Amino acid sequence: MSAILKATNINKIYDEGAVSTQVLTGLDLTVTAGERIAIVGTSGSGKSTLLHLLGGLDTPTSGEVWLHGQLLNSMNETERGAMRNKHLGFIYQFHHLLAEFTAIENVAMPLLMRPEVSTAEARQQAIDILNSVGLEHRLAHRPGELSGGERQRVAIARALVTKPSLILADEPTGNLDYDNAQSVFGLLSELQSTMQTALLMVTHDRNLAALADRQLLLRNGHWENY
Ligand SMILES: Nc1ncnc2c1ncn2[C@@H]1O[C@H](COP(=O)(O)OP(=O)(O)OP(=O)(O)O)[C@@H](O)[C@H]1O
């Protein structure tokens, strides 16, 4: 299986004046096409920091992050942004949808950043994916008019609309009750499997983690046996 993402010897140190904190230490990780990986670990173990680095939203203090054979940390912000838009989808615990835009407009947004995609095409693709997450009756609703589970479905649709090869998800069901979390995760799994998208998910929920192909435990910034 080919590697979509490869991180080697990742170290992250936050420097705040006199105090410096090493958050990640010598981490390696390879994600191959279509696989589902769950990262678990106690609060403060570095899970979100790692996801940020892997998604090119921040740079490691040392080490390398390769996405589709290209070294992210040698790129400038514009180049990293283009790589994110082309290859990655992001889902967060709190949906990060834009309050003043409808479901369709929120989902179409990543496509509208691509000059080759017309507004009409972006809108149609947004409608198609919103249909596949069961929100055909909520297309013109704004986030404030949707339930928590529905908002998370919109966020999933937005992450998948560009057909990314990898979804980075930080507690994607963390603010939902048990039933909603199961249903939203079920939907996410079904779509990523149909679309052959890999999934790297941070979760506190070991039951959810058990559904992934591979589980990784982060403790104090390094891997431990799960
Ligand atoms: N920008 C920053 N500047 C300084 N320290 C930071 C910064 N971001 C995170 N940290 C510190 O890095 C450590 C790891 O944080 P991180 O958010 O990655 O943990 P986490 O495992 O995702 O925790 P949680 O499960 O609570 O979300 C924490 O001690 C945090 O205070």
UniProtKB/Swiss-Prot annotation:
CDD domains for this protein: ABC_MJ0796_LolCDE_FtsE (cd03255)
GO BP, sorted A to Z: lipoprotein localization to outer membrane; protein localization to outer membrane
Keywords assigned by UniProt, alphabetized: ATP-binding, Cell inner membrane, Cell membrane, Membrane, Nucleotide-binding, Translocase, Transport
Residue span(s) of domain ABC transporter: 5-226
Gene Ontology molecular function, alphabetical: ATP binding; ATP hydrolysis activity; transmembrane transporter activity
Membrane topology type: Peripheral membrane protein
Cross-referenced Gene3D superfamilies: P-loop containing nucleotide triphosphate hydrolases
Subcellular location(s) per record: Cell inner membrane
Paired cysteines (S-S): none
Keyword Methyltransferase: no
Binding site for ATP: G41, T42, S43, G44, S45, G46, K47, S48
Keyword Acetylation: no
One of the record's GO cellular component terms: plasma membrane
Annotated function: Part of the ABC transporter complex LolCDE involved in the translocation of mature outer membrane-directed lipoproteins, from the inner membrane to the periplasmic chaperone, LolA. Responsible for the formation of the LolA-lipoprotein complex in an ATP-dependent manner.
Family of this protein: Belongs to the ABC transporter superfamily. Lipoprotein translocase (TC 3.A.1.125) family.
Subunit (UniProt): The complex is composed of two ATP-binding proteins (LolD) and two transmembrane proteins (LolC and LolE).
Protein name in UniProt: Lipoprotein-releasing system ATP-binding protein LolD
Source species: Psychrobacter cryohalolentis (strain ATCC BAA-1226 / DSM 17306 / VKM B-2378 / K5)
